[in-house]
Regions:
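Active-site nucleotide/adenylate-binding loops and adjacent lid/helix of ATP-dependent enzymes
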Residues: 19-148, 189-193
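ATP-binding N-terminal substructure of ATP-dependent carboxylate-amine bond-forming enzymes
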Residues: 1-47, 195-214
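ATP-dependent carboxylate activation and anion-phosphoryl transfer catalytic cores
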Residues: 75-77, 126-218
Length: 218
């Protein structure tokens, strides 16, 4: 069953059948220690990181640009996230979401194994979207393991952390499998686009919930 997002709401369509039940994310949610679920809650994580953030209903301290998204989103992929200018009140926003100061800078996805960095990739996308990425590239940027996660290393050997401008914004108890096989460049292909790969690239099917059907990889 394909889950898609339309006008801010999640709806299910029997359009295509994707295997969502056996994902690494499913396994994590079925087996995670309840005491560690705070890591999956982006509001709690952001508060622990001392960011300017709060739940919908709480006023922002200063007018500005904020990222507003669900506190918990197992499906990932930026579902429900939006960039908003907020003057003060947030009562009119979606219940269950939270707001956080807007960060600028490189968007990095980093895999750690027992606290040691194993992979770092940088994502690029147009400014007008939070979901449709243009590309992801492997690089050699070193990002220190977040100290806030030190006491979890023994229980979760693999962790994937996302950073914007050096700020930790998201944590997953799994690794990034898109770059398996020494892949260095991952270019998403969206519905309606050609699946004929550029010279030197291979096309692979990588369907997701935003209309991505695959990717050119090299």
């Amino acid at each position: 069953m394909l889950v898609t997002q339309t006008n801010g709401n999640i709806e299910q369509k029997m359009k295509k059948t994707y295997n969502l039940e056996d994902s690494a994310e499913d396994f994590v949610w079925k087996t995670i220690d309840p005491d560690d679920i705070w890591v999956m809650d982006k509001l709690i994580l952001s508060r622990k990181m001392k960011y300017n953030c709060g739940p919908v209903g709480q006023d922002v301290p200063v007018p500005g640009w904020y990222i507003v998204r669900p506190c918990v989103n197992m499906l990932g992929l930026g579902l429900g996230a939006e960039k908003l200018w907020i003057e003060e009140e947030t009562y009119n926003l979606t219940i269950g979401n939270f707001w956080c100061e807007w960060f600028e800078g490189k968007h990095l996805s980093v895999d750690y194994y027992k606290g040691k960095q194993m992979l770092c990739v940088e994502g690029h996308k147009p400014e007008h979207t939070l979901t449709k990425w243009k590309e992801w590239r492997r690089n050699d940027i070193h990002v220190p393991f977040p100290e806030i996660l030190n006491n979890l290393i023994q229980r979760y050997t693999w962790m994937n952390c996302e950073f914007i401008g050096g700020k930790l914004i998201e944590v997953h108890f799994r690794r990034n499998e898109d770059f398996d096989g020494n892949i260095n460049h991952f270019i998403p292909v969206w519905e309606g686009e050609s699946t004929t790969p550029p010279k030197g690239y291979t096309y692979r099917e990588y369907p997701d919930l935003h209309g991505r059907i695959g990717a050119f990889v090299k």
